[in-house]
Amino acid sequence: MPIISVFFGIVIRMFYKEHEPAHFHAEYQGQQGKFDLDGEMIVGNIRSGTALRLVREWATLHRRELEDNWESMKRGHPLGRIEPLQ
């Protein structure tokens, strides 16, 4: 479960051997969610509106890196770290 970014208490991961469509996982204060690459929560229980907004903002800024990591994951290659929100 490689961590690809951490910001404001939000941990972002991508798991190997995942299924389409492309997505990533976020955890915030013990709550978890699965997000599409646009940063929209597909399933999960993250209730903080602020955390959800920050994940969307981060995903929008780093869409290309998320796509690159998804392709690397499918090939079994190492995932790159992605800059956190500042």
Question: Could you tell me what each predicted segment is?
Answer:
Residues 1-86:
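Basic nucleic-acid-binding interfaces
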